[in-house]
Amino acid sequence: MKFFIDTADVNEIREAHELGLVDGVTTNPSLIAKSGRKFEEVIKEITGIVDGPISAEVVSLDHDGMIREAEELAAIHKNIVIKLPMTPEGLKACTTLTKKGIKTNVTLIFTAMQALLAAKAGATYVSPFVGRLDDISQDGMGIIDDIKTIFDNYGYTAEIIVASVRNPIHVLNAALIGADIATIPYSVMLQLAKHPLTDAGIERFLKDWEKVPK
């Protein structure tokens, strides 16, 4: 399974990349706003760190506006993937961009049927939001399982990006289901490497080492 990092913080991206964990990056307007920097400046810097897909989201809600923004973003770097909202206009834009050879990531997906529509429109990636579904007492990972089954049944090539990841269990379940990608906040990436028995083992080794004659 591939790991994308879900952030626009270039320091987090750089640190995760140095760990060898980053296959790609997902950003959105909210994450860019948190960085306090200009949008294009952030995206360009990210392309210099990670040699993999970098999702950048359009903010227009109409087809023509999305296409205009998408072409501007795609011109920044060959690795840019255009994030589109899961709406009728977004699907229309996805179809147009696919014909132009521009990669797309249809986002804000909350049902398996929405993912199917995105795949039929030619999406390169689909991004179901598991954490937000869990927040309203729905089964986020169950949606991932359904999407995987549908795509396997019909041979869709769109890759599943498990998004809105809140904890290591989300990542574990995504891997068990067979999702292609999990896009993970840096804080959760660090949690994946942690276990209290690992920490206790290191502490014990160090204490034992102190007893070794020098």
Curated annotation (Swiss-Prot):
EC number: 2.2.1.2
Major subcellular location class: cytoplasm
Reaction(s) the record says it catalyses: D-sedoheptulose 7-phosphate + D-glyceraldehyde 3-phosphate = D-erythrose 4-phosphate + beta-D-fructose 6-phosphate
Gene Ontology CC: one annotated term: cytoplasm
InterPro entries: Aldolase_TIM, TAL/FSA, Transaldolase_3B, Transaldolase_3B/F6P_aldolase, Transaldolase_AS, TSA/FSA_arc/bac
Enzyme active site: 83 (schiff-base intermediate with substrate)
Record GO terms (molecular function): aldehyde-lyase activity; transaldolase activity
Keywords attached to this entry: Cytoplasm, Pentose shunt, Schiff base, Transferase
Disulfide bond entries: none
Pathway(s) per entry: Carbohydrate degradation; pentose phosphate pathway; D-glyceraldehyde 3-phosphate and beta-D-fructose 6-phosphate from D-ribose 5-phosphate and D-xylulose 5-phosphate (non-oxidative stage): step 2/3
SUPFAM superfamilies recorded: Aldolase
NCBIfam families per record: fsa_talC_mipB
Task performed by this protein: Transaldolase is important for the balance of metabolites in the pentose-phosphate pathway.
Protein name per UniProt: Probable transaldolase
